[in-house]
C-alpha cells in the first residue's frame, strides 16, 4: 500500500471551444503540480475531466471544424440540400489534425467522465452537481482541487496549497484593494446573498470588515471538507433554481457565500489565478506589491458572457 498522499484534480471541459485547453492543462499538471523534485515522491496525482469529447477521431474533427466556422475561421459550402462541406484553410487544417491527436492522447492519460454538452454558463454553474455524481470515486483522494480548464500552469505549485481544510485563492481583480465592495450576491432572495460588505473581524481591539473575495477558478482542499462544501453549494444553487434565479457570478458567488461562513484554511494570493491580460507590474502600480503568475487564466478568442444570461433563461423555461 502506497504511503503517498493522493491528490485529485478535477475540471470541466464541455463544448469544442474549451477542448483545446485540456491537453495543455494536463501538461502543466504533469510538469508543475506538486512535481518539484524536492516533494514529488510524496504525492500521487490524478487528473479527472468531465467532458463531451467524442470517442471517434472523425467526430472530434467534425466538431472542431464546426467551432472554427462559428469563430469565423472557416467557411461552409453547400454541396446539396442535405450536405454542407466545411472549408478549412491549409494552416488551420494542420492545426485541426494536431488538435485531434492531442485530445486522443490526453484521453489515454486521464480519467474521463463522459458528460452531455450543456451551454455556458451551465458547465461552470453545475460543476458541483457533476462532481458529486462521482462522490464515491472522489473519496479515494486525500485532497481534491478544481481548476478551470482554460488555465496555464507556469510555475511550481507546491505544498502551500495543502492545509487542514479548504483552499481558496484571492480574486486577482480585488486583491489588496481598499474601500471597495466585493461583488457579493446583492439579491436577498438568493441563497448566496451576503448582507454585509465583508466578514466582521476584530484586529488590535477594533472591529472591521475583512473584504476578501475569492476566485472560482482554483479551489479545493481536504476531500471531506471540499465534498461538504460542494454539497452545500449544490443545495443552494438548486434552491435558487427553484425560485427561477441564478446568482450574479454563478458558482463563484456561491463559493464566496460558503467561505463567508466557513473560513478557508489556506488563502492563496492572485499568483494562482493570474489573468494573462494583466501588464507585468499591474499590482505594483495599483497597490505597491507584486505577484508573479503560477497559474494564468487565458484570454479566449470567443466570448461567453453575452450569451450566458440567454442560455440560463432558456434552461429555466424548461424547468
Across the structure, where does each feature detected by a protein language model lie?
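GT-A fold catalytic core of metal-dependent nucleotide-sugar glycosyltransferases
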Residues: 126-179
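Conserved glycosyltransferase catalytic-site signature
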Residues: 124, 128, 150-151, 248-255
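Short, solvent-exposed loop/turn segments at secondary-structure junctions
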Residues: 14-16, 54-56, 117-118, 151-153, ...
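PAPS-dependent sulfotransferase catalytic domain
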Residues: 160-225, 232
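N-terminal anchoring/stem segment of glycosyltransferases
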Residues: 1-123, 134-140, 300, 319
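Catalytic core and acceptor-binding pocket of nucleotide-sugar-dependent glycosyltransferases
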Residues: 198-303
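A structural signal for short, well-ordered beta-strand segments and their strand-loop junctions
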Residues: 48-49, 144-148, 153, 220, ...
Amino acid at each position: 500500500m502506497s504511503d503517498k498522499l493522493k491528490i485529485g484534480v478535477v475540471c470541466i471541459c464541455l463544448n469544442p471551444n474549451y477542448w483545446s485547453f485540456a491537453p495543455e492543462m494536463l501538461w502543466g499538471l504533469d510538469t508543475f503540480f506538486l512535481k518539484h523534485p524536492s516533494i514529488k515522491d510524496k504525492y500521487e496525482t490524478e487528473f479527472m475531466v468531465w467532458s463531451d469529447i467524442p470517442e471517434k477521431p472523425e467526430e472530434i474533427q467534425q466538431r472542431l471544424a464546426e467551432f472554427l466556422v462559428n469563430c469565423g475561421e472557416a467557411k461552409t459550402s453547400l454541396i446539396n440540400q442535405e450536405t454542407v462541406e466545411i472549408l478549412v484553410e491549409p494552416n488551420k487544417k494542420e492545426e485541426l489534425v494536431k488538435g485531434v491527436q492531442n485530445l486522443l492522447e490526453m484521453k489515454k492519460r486521464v480519467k474521463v467522465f463522459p458528460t452531455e454538452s450543456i451551454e455556458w454558463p451551465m458547465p461552470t454553474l453545475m460543476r458541483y452537481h457533476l462532481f458529486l455524481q462521482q462522490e464515491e470515486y472522489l473519496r479515494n483522494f486525500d485532497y481534491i482541487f478544481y481548476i478551470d480548464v482554460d488555465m496555464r500552469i507556469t510555475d511550481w505549485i507546491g505544498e502551500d496549497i495543502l492545509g487542514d481544510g479548504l483552499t481558496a485563492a484571492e480574486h486577482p481583480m480585488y486583491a489588496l484593494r481598499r474601500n471597495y465592495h466585493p461583488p457579493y450576491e446583492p439579491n436577498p432572495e438568493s441563497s448566496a446573498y451576503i448582507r454585509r460588505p465583508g466578514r466582521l473581524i476584530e484586529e488590535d481591539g477594533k472591529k472591521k470588515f475583512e473584504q476578501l473575495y475569492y476566485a472560482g477558478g482554483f479551489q479545493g482542499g481536504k476531500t471531506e471538507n471540499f465534498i461538504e462544501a460542494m454539497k452545500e453549494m449544490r443545495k443552494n444553487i438548486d434552491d435558487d433554481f427553484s425560485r427561477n434565479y441564478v446568482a450574479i457570478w454563478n458558482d463563484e458567488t456561491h463559493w464566496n457565500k460558503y467561505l463567508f461562513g466557513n473560513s478557508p484554511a489556506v488563502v492563496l494570493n492572485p499568483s494562482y489565478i493570474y489573468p494573462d491580460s494583466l501588464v507585468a507590474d499591474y499590482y505594483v502600480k495599483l497597490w505597491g506589491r507584486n505577484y508573479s503568475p503560477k497559474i494564468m487564466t487565458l484570454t479566449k478568442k470567443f466570448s461567453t458572457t453575452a450569451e450566458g444570461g440567454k442560455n440560463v433563461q432558456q434552461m429555466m423555461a424548461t424547468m
